[in-house]
Amino acid sequence: MKTLFLGVTLGLAAALSFTLEEEDITGTWYVKAMVVDKDFPEDRRPRKVSPVKVTALGGGNLEATFTFMREDRCIQKKILMRKTEEPGKFSAYGGRKLIYLQELPGTDDYVFYCKDQRRGGLRYMGKLVGRNPNTNLEALEEFKKLVQHKGLSEEDIFMPLQTGSCVLEH
């Protein structure tokens, strides 16, 4: 019985991992809604966001690239997301951040959910993303359910202004 359970579990894990790789997670994603935990400073919440470009690096690893303005300068941020044993789970910054990618059923949208370990504490952030900048109300409702399931408050969901990528200075 244990052997059968182990076989089914490993098969399911392999199937889930295969599904995530098969579904094209690469490309441009538009941030439609965000949520952060209550400990996240209000003044650090992004009011404007650029699209996120996800690139496959091989071996199941991904790179997420986006730009933002800081003190009138365009800054580009690249995050190396290393594949873990758990399907849909990636680590970044030496394991300090754990990033989960979850497709929302019945939509073309995903949730990028992040646990960030800082100075002995944990911070949580979630992003509802899609292939186009239009907000899908079904996906937004699913995002709200997921937010509550993760222990975050629906009241902390906000919709930043979607902008284009800024131009880097050379």
Swiss-Prot record:
Record-level GO BP terms: glucose homeostasis; sensory perception of chemical stimulus; sensory perception of smell
UniProt protein name: Odorant-binding protein 2a
Pfam families: Lipocalin
Family: Belongs to the calycin superfamily. Lipocalin family.
Subunit organization: Monomer.
GO cellular component, one term: extracellular space
Function: Binds and transports small hydrophobic volatile molecules with a higher affinity for aldehydes and large fatty acids, including undecanal, palmitic acid, efficient aldehydes, benzenic aldehydes, heterocyclic aldehydes and aliphatic acids.
Organism domain of life: Eukaryota
Keywords: Disulfide bond, Olfaction, Secreted, Sensory transduction, Signal, Transport
InterPro entries cross-referenced by the UniProt entry: Calycin, Lipocalin, Lipocln_cytosolic_FA-bd_dom, von_Ebner_gland
Disulfide bonds: C74-C166
Entry GO MF terms: odorant binding; small molecule binding
Subcellular location: Secreted
Tissue: Strongly expressed in the nasal structures, salivary and lachrymal glands, and lung. Expressed in the liver.
Species, as recorded: Homo sapiens
Keyword Transcription: no
Signal peptide: 1-15
Main location: secreted
